[in-house]
Amino acid sequence: MSEYRLTCVNNSSLHGSFALYQVPPSAPGPMGPACLAWLARPAAPGTQVRFSWSTEVGFIWGERGTFGGRTTFTAYQYVAADPERENLIDFGSDSFGAPTFQNLRTGGAQGALTIRQLNATFDFPIHLGIALGKSPIYTVDFNVNVLGAFIPHRNRCWVVFGSYTAGEAIDAEAQTNVQVVDFNPS
């Protein structure tokens, strides 16, 4: 697995945080995945921050909630995957009714991570999606008997400066002054 580093410099007179996020390759709009601030770090004027992460990808589920007017995601389970091999997993409940991933295997679309959402009911809202470097990048609402495919950008990220925390939902379509950073995978 590759590991990347990115240094961001705050050359402004503003206090805030740099946030890294991903934009899903398709399905924008209300039914598309929620983009999350996958990494975030505060930077005072005249300072710099460094991010580093692994390009390991995997499946993730948890809860999304609102606190202080911000929507954030808290992860409860992570399962490492490979978009070219073990890229299909089932999501449902165990014999006690607890939400869980199970049955990681080959068989999903090449280059994508696919979640088969089984027939299950939960007493609280479940969100599931994918992670990069074990941090969530996109999530969707759990929907019974739906197949969800996600394509991670392992070698690209979007950077924005403002008031962000890791796990916070970002409206990618509303962002301005965004920097897209591409990494050479070799």
Indicate where each model-derived feature is located.
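Intrinsically disordered, low-complexity segments enriched in small/polar residues
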Residues: 1-186
